[in-house]
Structures are given as structure tokens and as C-alpha cells.
């Protein structure tokens, strides 16, 4: 008997998830984590309705991929059940490596490590847990499988990822120009020489797709206010890393603190090492902290301070001091006794570069929980 889980999606209606491998992926904590990651990052400052998550997007992309596989098979393109399941698994996990605030953090607190790199690492980790059941899905994700059109459904110029985020982002922002005819496009898909193609009568739908994508970038993804908020967040994080490198004690959640006080790049990320000591070393510790686990990690409510800092933050606020500023009499808290009472940094700044940006971002809960 065919068992399935039915999820009611506001964009596509009922989404069927077969019990078994795909359902196990959906239930996995690493995918469920995406319920706490907004799809559009800071765009909600412009479009208050843009509160949807990357988990919702992953389910939508899965639904479109299922429709596309059925359509391609109906046109005589032979697709094994194992291949269909693998490409569905790949699209479910394609964004599993995303952190908060969309792409803002990728080149700010971690250098040279993209969300695709992290997605692949987490896929391989889940694959080990599932005794190799995701090997084919990983091959498709990495474009190492002979049937190239399967990878193009996951990542390409006309992939199911783009089709879902255009429709979903249009729905939640209210920008109707992004509402594409995804059903029509999928019906026009076919395979020629192992590559995804579109029938000639679907050319106008593709033109509308390209136009909609351009308009969504113009009106939503690159909106001047959203970009300005992203720049402020980047400035705050870069300033925080600068202060952390000088030994200044900063107010941060355990996970964010790990990234601020350790130089994480692609080499250290994959070599399971960090140059500086921390409560949790290596990629294993990095994953635990990023998931809100590990030594010193506590589950944090969005927008709430860490429990061990709550009283300290209250004390600072009672004295009119920003809890994100270095402790002490308006100066640095470092190992250098001569630094007491002096402004932080050689340039004479007292952390105002960080503080100013943080005050502007505080209404969104940004300074308190970045990885909670």
C-alpha cells in the first residue's frame, strides 16, 4: 500500500511526500532547521509579508521536480524509480547549507565557503547516517551522473529551484510581476541528447519567465532598502570580527561567538581544525554550534539574549550602556592592562561603528541571535 504524507502548501496546494527515504529527509533535523531560516533574509524590512522560509521553498521545489519527472516520463524519457527518488532527494536538500540572512554571511564570517559547499557536506553526513541511500542523489547534485538533465532540474537556467522561488517570493511579497506560469513551462519540458530542452510552442512562457526574474531582482532581491540593511549587517559583523581579533569581549550567542573568535576558511573548515582555541574545535564542533548544540550552546528564542548573558545585559542597560559594547569603563576588555579605559582599536573608535549599525538592526533581533 502506497503511504504518503500530505502537506498543504499556500502556493501549490497539496504536496505529497512518499513515506520512506524522502519522508525521512524531510523529518531530518538538518532540513527542519530551514524552518528557522527566512527565504528572503532582510527583505522583510521592505515587504512585511516575506516571512516564508527555506523549508517551504525546499518543499515547493520538491513538488515541481516531482511534476517535471512525471511529465518527462510521459514523453517517453525513461527514468528509473531510483533516479526519480534521487533527484527529488537532491532538490529537497539543495538549500540545506544555507545560514541566516540569505547570502549575506557567506563571505563575511566564513571566507571561501559557499552554501553549496556546506549543503554538499551535510548531504554526505546524512548519507552516512542513512547507510549510503543518498549516494545517487549526491551524484546528481554534483553533476556526476550520466543523465545530465536530472542535474539541470536541480541546478540550471530553468531549474525547479528558480521556478519555485519566483512564484513563492511573488506570492509572499505581493509583487505580482514575479508570478510565472510554472505549470505551463513544465508541460513544455523535454529531453534531447541528455539535456533539458523546451518545446518551441513554450517559447513565450520562457520569455515571461526571464522577464519575471529580471523584475523580481529589480523590485525585491536588489531593493535599495534591503541592500542597505544587508550592508549595515555586514559592517556590524566585520567590526565585530575586528574587535574579537583584538581580544575584546563581545556579546554573542555561542554559535556566532565561534565564528567571530575563530578564523574559519575553506581549509580549516574541511580539515576539522581552527587556529584559535574554542569551546568546540573543528568542523564537527562547528556543525554542532551552528545547530545550537555542543558545549556551551543553549536553545535560544529568536530575538532573546543568551541566558548566561541576560543578567549582564540587564545590568548594562540599567547603567545606560549598550550590552554589545566592550565591558569596562567605556574602554576595551582585553588582556592588555594598559588598554583599560581607552577607546577600542588603534583608530580611536570606541566600537561605535559596530554599535551604530547594531542599533539600527536591533528592531529585527539581528544582534542577539544570528545562528539560534
Residues of each region from the PLM?
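Short active-site segment of divalent metal-dependent hydrolases/proteases
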Residues: 93, 97-98
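Short alpha-helical catalytic segment bearing the HExxH-like zincin motif
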Residues: 87-92
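Histidine-centered, transition-metal-coordinating active-site segments
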Residues: 1-86, 100-106, 110-372
